[in-house]
Amino acid sequence: MPKPASMAMNTTKSTTPAHVISPANIEWQTDDAGNEVPVSGEFGDAYFSQADGLAESHHVFLAHNQLPTRLANLIPKQCFTIYELGFGTGLNLLATWQLWRQLRLTHPHLASARLHFITTEKHPVPFSDLAKILAPLGQRTPELALLIEQLLTSYPPLIAGCHRLDFIDDNLTLDIWLGDANDSLASLDSTVATQRPYINAWFLDGFAPSCNEILWTERIFSHMQRLSRAGTTAATYSCAGIIKRGLQSQGFVIKKSKVLGSKREMLTAVMSEMSSLDKPISTLSNKVTLSNYPNNAVVIGAGVAGLLTAWSLANRGISVTVLDKDAPLAGASGNPRALLAPNMTPIHHVYEHLHSIGYLYSGRLYRYFNQQAAIQKSPLILEQTGTLDLLVKTNIGTEQILDYPDTMATTISPEKAQDISGLKDKDLAHNLYMPQAGLVNPQALQTVILAHPNITYQQLNIINIKETENSIILTGSKEDENASQASLTITADHVVICAAYESHQLDKRIVKCRTIRGQLSWFTPTAQQLTQLPKLPLKYSGYCAPFIGQSGDAELNHISENQPQFLLGASFIDGDTNIDVRDEENQQNYDKLIEDMPELSSVLPNDISTWHARAGIRTQTMDYHPLVGLLAQSQRLWSMSAMGAKGYAIAPICAEALADMMLGCFTPLSAAMLARLSPNRARLHKVHKHKTRQAVI
């Protein structure tokens, strides 16, 4: 919006390091009508008018990008992508979301269409300010009140990187990239797989050049050209010369229009055909069209990677068959509980830290699954207990946590740490508390995912995979009713291999990974022991957690419903692929806990033979990144494996990225991150070839 004359521009330069977020400084000023107006302290510009901000958003960005008509004319399963420069208060998102919901009610063919709203913000509005700013809007427009509530519930912590918020019931995906706009735009990969994603409409809503000239650079307009195609539109409040020249230089045809109810002018633009003709022909294979949109896919492997991949594909309208030679969660993913807690890194590295990005998305997704579980009257997927890290084994000091939002990680007083943990006799001066961390129930997760109407599960041992021009043919075997092996052939549009360390056996293009055996231990504490054991999950040189048995636990791990349990994890045996239960590894788990918390030596039962345990095989690459993407020289065969010990934290975001790549959409991971995850990355294959040559010698 144009800068009010009374609002002076702040020219103070930020000294915040790159990739460390500096939240917006909100100043409240009173306009001529007596309304409180939120103003950016950084740029001296109003976010929007409290009197008619929503109407202006509809007029400038929705109407002048022809969104009512363009969205109504989407074909089934088509995805429309909007990119907004300047998320601000989320007003444009809310206006677009409101329109999208209205259109879906009156246009049944939009039931399977999707809206992808990508936005960037360098100085995001803190949660408390955002709630205050949007409250009057919700009061005046009850239809928006529900959307505001959903946005605030999902609003991410203010750390750099992409935060994906899925509003699944509305087929709306919101990607909020926090950080410099140039970095965020550069992170969008327009060359993934065989499809070229593109932006359909641009909302240029950054503060006016008179306040924020640094935003409107040649690089911004160059990225717009790279990410657009013929017919891509743009709209902005500003008619400043720097914006007009920037758009024209990149092939946009511009036009001035009047702002609703005002003498002020605004700008619209359309990418010309000639500009698109300058691009290589190969880059013009746009998003998946109805003719080549995959109808079905097969996922091989029913562990956490396979289940989450199936979920992401099914949510995009693809019929998914999950195949596994064993029952779901029979491998390393089937422990009684999985600890979901952030693996902390210095905050200036978080922008490209897969575990941090994945942890935040996983938490949001699992909380959505909790809602579905409540409807199905099944156990919660995520029990948000909070987790206390005793900082026994860490590469980060508490001083490096100070810039993290308290909702993600914070240090607490020793007294409070003792109170929430129940460890009254333990010195907890050094600690890190993660309030949104907790325990994932794998069996409950499987139940919710396999209940999706687009997902089916079948037990089948895959013997052969053959790719043709138009499909992939799978041959497998299974026991028939007479206990004989019967052969079965399945044809699919796409296949995703999620078979952990056995992935290499299914396709040699998937590098052979490191195998690490891990055994988790648990026991049933007495009532007296329960009063003395930790009351929430703890991280030390291992980890431990109390939990209560739920329905489904008996089937997978022989744990009775409503029975208290205490688990300890986990052993780490390199190169061992046997999954027999071993007393010596139960002892190792016991010893790690007692070494770090000797106060519990008199509490834990020391007869290890009475403990229960489960062993699984983790799969890990030499560079610790999973294998996610399309296999070399293939158009239909994908890898989603090698999650290591972090599957429940990183599989959801990796599955989203894979599904987006398959369908030619922008992913929530940067181009650099996708390159590091590629199953074809050169560094990984060079290491593998070197080790193979050494073995032969």
From Swiss-Prot:
Major subcellular site: cytoplasm
Cellular localisation: Cytoplasm
Protein name: tRNA 5-methylaminomethyl-2-thiouridine biosynthesis bifunctional protein MnmC
Its EC number(s): 2.1.1.61, 1.5.-.-
Annotated segments matching region tRNA (mnm(5)s(2)U34)-methyltransferase: 1-272
Record's keyword annotation contains S-adenosyl-L-methionine: yes
Cross-referenced SUPFAM superfamilies: Nucleotide-binding domain
Protein function: Catalyzes the last two steps in the biosynthesis of 5-methylaminomethyl-2-thiouridine (mnm(5)s(2)U) at the wobble position (U34) in tRNA. Catalyzes the FAD-dependent demodification of cmnm(5)s(2)U34 to nm(5)s(2)U34, followed by the transfer of a methyl group from S-adenosyl-L-methionine to nm(5)s(2)U34, to form mnm(5)s(2)U34.
